[in-house]
Regions:
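A conserved helix-loop-strand patch within extracytoplasmic ligand-binding domains
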Residues: 98-148, 251
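Periplasmic-binding protein-like
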Residues: 99-110, 135-142, 201-243, 245-270
Length: 270
């Protein structure tokens, strides 16, 4: 009888041990935009083959924070902090920033003019329609001297501006709010289009060359982040990926691949 109990106990212990081993070797599932995020993650597969990384490329309309909240992925890599904070409020969830990786400067593009001073009166300006990137676009338009926001909008990382907060619009620009991923398609219609760096790259634009106006990387609050859940924040796989994403090898890959259109956080803070 004792032997049977011992064998049963040993079987339970072995089962638990195998489960633990299985959990440890499961791939780390990371949801990412195709460009540049998935490209950077796929480069990490080459420099750190010991990390079993499963890259899940996001398609339009898929909310990577919902995937993370529901446990469908272990981390995501596509967003900046103001957007993350907005998402936490919308979803009623708390996430953890595991690493600040790179900056994709927001850019102003046009197929109708060659320089911002050429912009005509009553021109149409397409901007992202989500609150954090809409505000970011308005701050960029202000930086370029096209509009003026209410004086209390001084810090884009803590205050969200809307078109209602424009107090001076000398060229009577018409602000059109469009889903961010669709903005490159607006280049044939709008006079100016403010496009996130990743969508510009996907559309074949080179932000460092093609943008008529571009965000500065200096003290830029829009670093793209590796984000996970509180439960996985100290998972060795997350820790390893965070270290890889901020490594000199990845920094070199970003600089050599994107030529200033994507900027490693370390370079932006130098």
């Amino acid at each position: 009888m004792i032997n049977k109990k011992l064998f049963a106990l040993a079987g339970v212990t072995l089962s638990l041990s195998l489960s633990a081993i299985s959990a440890q070797v499961e791939p780390l599932r990371v949801a990412a935009d195709p460009v540049p995020h998935a490209e950077i993650l796929n480069d990490i597969k080459k420099i750190d083959p010991k990390l079993d990384l499963k890259v899940i490329e996001l398609t339009s309309g898929v909310n990577a924070n919902e995937l993370l909240a529901h446990g469908d992925v272990d981390a995501n890599y596509f967003q900046h902090l103001p957007y993350l904070k907005d998402q936490e409020k919308a979803l009623g969830k708390t996430f953890v920033v595991a690493a600040e990786v790179h900056i994709e400067p927001l850019g102003i593009y046009s197929r109708k003019i060659k320089a911002l001073p050429d912009l005509p009166e009553n021109a149409s300006v397409a901007v992202p329609n989500n609150s954090s990137n809409l505000s970011r676009a308005l701050f960029l338009l202000q930086k370029q001297g096209l509009i003026t926001l209410n004086a209390h909008f001084t810090d884009p990382s803590t205050t969200l501006a809307t078109p209602k907060d424009i107090v001076a619009n000398p060229k009577h620009l018409k602000i059109l709010e469009i889903e961010a991923a669709q903005l490159p398609r607006s280049l044939d219609d709008a006079d100016l289009v403010v496009i996130n760096g990743n969508y510009a790259l996907e559309a074949g634009l080179v932000p460092s060359k093609d943008a008529l106006g571009l965000e500065s990387a200096d003290h830029n609050p829009y670093a793209n982040l590796l984000v996970t859940t509180p439960e996985l924040a100290h998972d060795p796989r997350i820790v390893a990926l965070a270290k890889d994403l901020t490594s000199p090898q990845v920094r070199d890959f970003i600089q050599k691949t994107y030529h200033g259109s994507v900027i490693p956080v370390q370079a932006g803070h130098d």
